[in-house]
Amino acid sequence: MLTNPSQVIIRNQETLSQHRVLVLNHEADSLPKALLDVAQSVDALALDYHHYLHLAPQANAKLRCYFGHQLPHQDKYDTVIVYFPKAKPLAPYLFNLAAQHLVADGQLLVVGENKGGVKSLVKLLPKYFATGVKLDNARHCLLFGSSLIDTAPEIKLSDWTSQYQLSTPQGNITICNLVGVFSEKHLDQGTELLLSHLPTLSGRVLDFGCGAGVIAAALLKAQPTLSLECIDINAMALASCELTLAANGMTAKVYPSDGLAQTSGKFDGIISNPPFHDGLASTTSIAQRFVADSAKQLQSKGIWQIVTNRHLPYSDTIAAEFGQLTVPAENNKYKLYSFQQA
């Protein structure tokens, strides 16, 4: 089953005949493999770990699958396909990355849903690309084409990172935020509620949905001896978290995980402001699965604490998994749940 943007690419796949193709920011479908019907070879870079896990089992000699914010090599391609990102500020970064991997006069294809911001493509394309041309309009999506006409600047993460000081109940910390990663450049109310009632932890602690590393840095600021693990599904978030920890002289294990699937063993503490945005729609499925899985991975005497939006229906799921739990704090927008394992 192909997503609507992928179906639009298939409608125009004749432009990829015998091309070496790179697909950036692909979705959770088999489009890269399907392109092998016409392309010479296909490489795919996922920025969402779930999308990578969907495609990776299909890899073969002509299809290489990667996860991260950059490729681990400098290979060049005849065509780069970019799926227009849900987080619009990420688009210029993806165009810069595409240019790094295109041959001279190489083809750029950009596809996206009409409601997702792709209509602004022509204005967003950097000057080292030719003016974008609309190639197709179908499945509530648009496909644009362009070509590389000039040398693009080398990608430096520092050019795509905003750095700022954040005041937390644990003290001031430095946050490094790559484009496309959620940040209000001040402590959001949910995280503030969580950090204002942070329990004393010890041993092995998990920060689920770490984002740019705000909770991680605050945890280590207050309790520097923790063995902290930070997980997220988003490559830009993981890179941001690593930069944040480095900027504060802190260390933690930072790695991708689809829910808790890539974690192992039990934790003495699990802390989170769970993500509740999936693409363009608000959803609770990620957090509900996290609640169910984390209940199984909490060590004896371990502490579990999360903050959630009041309007999201977590209460029943949490009660079903943990039974007796406390609400240390709440306000008109957020609610803090806490549980200690017997």
UniProtKB/Swiss-Prot annotation:
GO terms for cellular component: cytoplasm. Keywords: Cytoplasm, Methyltransferase, rRNA processing, S-adenosyl-L-methionine, Transferase. GO terms for molecular function: 16S rRNA (guanine(1207)-N(2))-methyltransferase activity; nucleic acid binding. It catalyses: guanosine(1207) in 16S rRNA + S-adenosyl-L-methionine = N(2)-methylguanosine(1207) in 16S rRNA + S-adenosyl-L-homocysteine + H(+). Specifically methylates the guanine in position 1207 of 16S rRNA in the 30S particle. InterPro entries: DNA_methylase_N6_adenine_CS, Mtase_sm_N, rRNA_ssu_MeTfrase_C, RsmC/RlmG, SAM-dependent_MTases_sf, Small_mtfrase_dom. It is found in: Cytoplasm. This is Ribosomal RNA small subunit methyltransferase C. It comes from the Bacteria. Its EC number is 2.1.1.172. Belongs to the methyltransferase superfamily. RsmC family. The lineage of its organism: Bacteria, Pseudomonadati, Pseudomonadota, Gammaproteobacteria, Alteromonadales. It comes from Shewanella sp. (strain ANA-3). Monomer.
